Every structure is written in C-alpha cells, then in structure tokens.
Amino acid sequence: MLSYTTHIGLNTNVNTYGYLYIGGSVSTIIGDQGGSNQKRATSTSQGVASHKAMIHSFQTLIDNPSTSSTTYDVRFGHGNNATHTIYINNDSADYNGAYYARFVSTLTILELAP
C-alpha cells in the first residue's frame, strides 16, 4: 500500500497535478485519457488564490510489487503555460507572519504479507 499527502504552494491560481513515479518512470496508476488536451495525473488540486497552500493526497494498493529495491517519488506540474515554481511544504509567499505556516508532507509505503 502506498499513500502520499503533500502540501504545495504556487504563485498563481491554476490547478496542480501530481504524478507517481515508480523506478524512475511515470506509474500506470494515472487517470484515463479524455480529450487530447486533458492532463492525465495521479492526483490533482484545485487552483486557489495566489500564495495559498494546496493539498495533494492519494492512496493505492500496488498488487504486483517488485522483489528488488525500488524507488518511489511524486512529481508535480501545473496547468499554466508559463514558468512557475512549485513550493513543497509552504505557500509561495513564505512570509514571516502569524497567518502563514510551513507544513509537512508524507510518503508512506506499507508491505502487506499474504
């Protein structure tokens, strides 16, 4: 079983997309193809106002795990054609104010014995 929760920030109000990578390649655990311009992703977060944090959360059972060492990671993109930095564990402003915070993200892998 694999699950992740990631807090991200972006300095624009577009959707963000999470992609699960297994062994350095995009996982097949991804949305179905729709229209030719639609993104396919493992997770998504609805765009909010600039400088606000968003949450990506996902959980799945990997039923054909490898018996050798395997790397898992999550990568993010956004729905804007311009270049924007995606911030992990804080919003894009990262101000030193009482109304801003830093967060924690997790990637958990549980091995289940038969």
Q: Can you annotate each of these PLM segments?
A:
Residues 1-69, 73-114:
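Terminal beta-strand-rich extracellular "head" domains
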